[in-house]
A protein has these predicted regions:
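C-terminal motif of bacterial Sec signal peptides marking the signal peptidase cleavage site
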Residues: 18-21
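N-terminal secretory/targeting leader peptides
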Residues: 23-29, 36, 49-150, 159, ...
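Short extracytoplasmic/periplasmic juxtamembrane "stem" segments immediately C-terminal to an N-terminal membrane anchor
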Residues: 36-42
Length: 367
């Protein structure tokens, strides 16, 4: 198990001190008004200089940002774009300190650190946020969206408005906005998966998220919930036969070197990573600073969405070149076979009204 580094940031705010000039003895009787004026001006100048010297420190903000991405993943590049944009917009008064590759812990741990203000921000999926606001569970149910454009239309529009009612904030978090992560696909070491029946009996690793677990339990897989940081070891030691992740993660973590021979393009769920900040940190920013963070997040979002989509075919070709057997599947078959997962998600979410409201959003964005 990787040794995890707990990151806690203390921002130092220097107090402006006024420099005052004072004499040791009684003023001479011959002091003139001009001399007093000169002394007062010197004192005022000293005070002004002291305030100017300490002001930048008082305004300085550091954002410690944790995420899970490997060095070459789109999320890593997007995080760097966020950093450069924040620092550019703020004129250097705001800086971003990035810790990738789960250096600060897994998604659950990073969200917990963010919620208590130990770090300022993290990039986590809806499957992590649903522990704080259950409605996020609906976003990654199987086969909800016809494609990327519909997914973006839902999470950027009606869903964002719906969950912007303070529930997440009451748990110490604020979602600045969804970026992207992609549609998830299946890999395994045992056999080519062409149909839902081919999954039966395979030991499949998923995150500890009801949406993912239910998808593969509905296909008859032996689902093992294992942290991503332990995935490569589990695959190499054959603790599990396979796993499911977006193509960028499969490629950039070289899963063909971890006994993964077969790739099935199931595209069973879509999800994004969300720039999630500590709500207390967010409330402590000025309106202008929040604007910098929001604008930088939007820039990173747009970059990541473009990269995720444009690189899909490239990833598929590279995975094939690396020796993986790539299989297109009939997604309608998988959609039908995974239908029971909807019942599990609905039971977990707990509100038929929420489910109906969410599906109405999806239907409206399909028009």
């Amino acid at each position: 198990m990787r040794k995890r580094k707990a990151a806690a940031l203390v921002m130092s705010l220097a107090l402006a001190s006024a420099l005052t000039a004072c004499g040791g003895g009684q003023p001479a009787a011959t002091d003139t008004t001009a001399a007093k004026t000169e002394a007062g001006a010197a004192e005022a100048a000293a005070e002004t200089k002291a305030k100017e010297e300490t002001a930048p420190a008082a305004d300085a903000v550091t954002i410690v940002l944790g995420h899970f991405g490997a060095p070459n993943e789109p999320v890593t590049a997007a995080a760097e774009t966020f950093k450069s944009k924040v620092e550019e917009l703020s004129g250097g008064t705001m800086t971003v300190e990035i810790h990738g590759a789960s250096e600060l812990g897994d998604a659950k741990e990073m969200a917990e650190q963010t919620s208590i203000g130990a770090i300022q921000a993290c990039l986590v999926s809806q499957g992590t946020l649903d522990k704080y606001d259950i409605r996020y569970a609906l976003v990654t149910a199987p086969y909800v969206y016809s494609g990327y454009d519909q997914a973006y239309a839902v999470v950027d529009g009606p869903f964002a408005e719906w969950v912007g009612d303070g529930v997440l904030e009451s748990k110490g978090l604020h979602n600045v906005g969804p970026w992207d992560y992609g549609f998830r696909c299946l890999t395994n070491s045992k056999r080519e998966v062409k149909t839902p029946e081919d999954v039966k009996g395979l030991k499949i690793r998923t995150p500890s998220e009801i949406q993912k677990v239910a998808c593969f339990e509905s296909l008859g897989a032996d689902v093992q919930q294992i942290a991503f940081s332990e995935l490569i070891t589990a695959l190499k030691q054959k603790t599990v036969d396979g796993q499911e992740n977006p193509l960028s993660t499969i490629y950039n973590n070289s899963l063909w070197e971890a006994e993964q021979k077969y790739l099935s393009l199931t595209r069973h769920t879509w999800e994004s990573v969300n720039l999630t900040v500590s709500d207390s940190f967010w409330e402590g920013l000025t309106e202008e600073q929040r604007g910098f963070v929001q604008e930088a997040s939007n820039a990173a979002r747009d970059q990541m969405r473009t990269e995720v989509q444009s690189n899909e075919q490239d990833y598929i070709q590279k995975l094939s070149d690396a020796g993986m057997v790539v299989t297109e599947v009939d997604m309608e078959q998988f959609k039908e076979a995974m239908a029971p997962a909807w019942d599990a998600v609905a039971e977990y979410e707990g509100s038929p009204e929420d489910m109906d409201f969410f599906l109405k959003m999806v239907d409206e964005t399909a028009k």
